[in-house]
């Protein structure tokens, strides 16, 4: 059983999603957005750091998963996104969480089945996978999708030297 925190970083809106993995079952614990209303970037970064730290304290996740920075058409936007991502990762590292990174196309492929999926498709599949009554807001859905992707990619994560691993039918389990 593991609690996974997914983060969809943004300099104005940072989405978060928390799920628990119990075997093959994924259980929704919470999601939302950290909104930064202040105009200056340093204050926004401070709010993102504080918000992510608060979420970590509230949910006590075992793992932190975050979307990788993609190349934006606007270099200034990409730099701001990278800074927002950096303070979110810093909050995780300061709380001794392992950090895992996933590309946006990888997340969409994992959750929807195609790397070119749009936001509404991601929202729909997150709702379906986690059995939610309504689709989460786009940024929160992206964060939940990142957490789901971590579960998919690490379902059979091998820990070298783990004495509990047993070779069964050609697979380490």
Swiss-Prot record:
Gene Ontology CC annotations of this record: cytoplasm; Holliday junction resolvase complex
PROSITE patterns in the cross-refs: RUVC (PS01321)
CDD domains xrefs: RuvC (cd16962)
Catalyzed reaction equations: Endonucleolytic cleavage at a junction such as a reciprocal single-stranded crossover between two homologous DNA duplexes (Holliday junction)
Pfam families: RuvC (PF02075)
Keyword Hydrolase included in the entry's annotation: yes
Function (record text): The RuvA-RuvB-RuvC complex processes Holliday junction (HJ) DNA during genetic recombination and DNA repair. Endonuclease that resolves HJ intermediates. Cleaves cruciform DNA by making single-stranded nicks across the HJ at symmetrical positions within the homologous arms, yielding a 5'-phosphate and a 3'-hydroxyl group; requires a central core of homology in the junction. The consensus cleavage sequence is 5'-(A/T)TT(C/G)-3'. Cleavage occurs on the 3'-side of the TT dinucleotide at the point of strand exchange.
Subunit comment: Homodimer which binds Holliday junction (HJ) DNA. The HJ becomes 2-fold symmetrical on binding to RuvC with unstacked arms; it has a different conformation from HJ DNA in complex with RuvA. In the full resolvosome a probable DNA-RuvA(4)-RuvB(12)-RuvC(2) complex forms which resolves the HJ.
Name listed for the protein in its UniProt record: Crossover junction endodeoxyribonuclease RuvC
Species name: Proteus mirabilis (strain HI4320)
Gene name of this polypeptide: ruvC
